[in-house]
Amino acid sequence: MILSLLLVSCSTSSDTEVPASTAQPETTDPADAISWESCGDGLECGYLDVPIDYTDENSATTSLYLTKHMATSSSQRIGTLLVNPGGPGFGGSFLAESAANIYSPTLLKSFDIVAWDPRGTGQSIPAIDCTDDYDYFFAGGDITPDTDQERAEGIATYKEFTDLCFEKNGDLLPYVGTNNSARDMDMIRRALGEDKISYFGFSYGSELGATWATLFPDTVRAADLDGASDP
């Protein structure tokens, strides 16, 4: 109920101070930016291509997987609510797929619920995959080392895992992080044809949301950051 009241009633002030490092929001023609297809139970699914490296105008692209649960009332629709479950390291598209079981009727009437698998995760392309045997690295590891030898063994194992990740995903890994994910969020907004969107993120999703709001304050209608990270 609190989330519904916050997002339905709140809007951001138009005189928000813009930090010097703030990225400039843009609008785009939404046509064909996301190729939505029906994926059952009133859901739409699609992909959006975004630059891997936002500093390179000739960058290759990565494809973000998105899901959308349409607002149940066209007359009461406010706009888009972008949602992220935190982590990081796993997809978030399930937050729209399970919208009917997660959000209040008020939110479902008022917003298109849009979720996505952040770059490198879930059904986004490419997805980071480091090994065929994750149990080898994590199931038998000692997460509470008591001796220097145990600590050294743990460090060696994690280094082996990290080296494998870079060997298999080196073209993408340097560009998987909070700032680029926040820029991806603005690309999603642009592709949806929205001037402003609302956001709900919890756990690490609060840090992602705060970064997005700092970079693109003029595009924030409202934001709910649940379980916020310690600044």
Place the predicted regions along the sequence by residue.
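Sec-dependent N-terminal signal peptides
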Residues: 1-3, 17
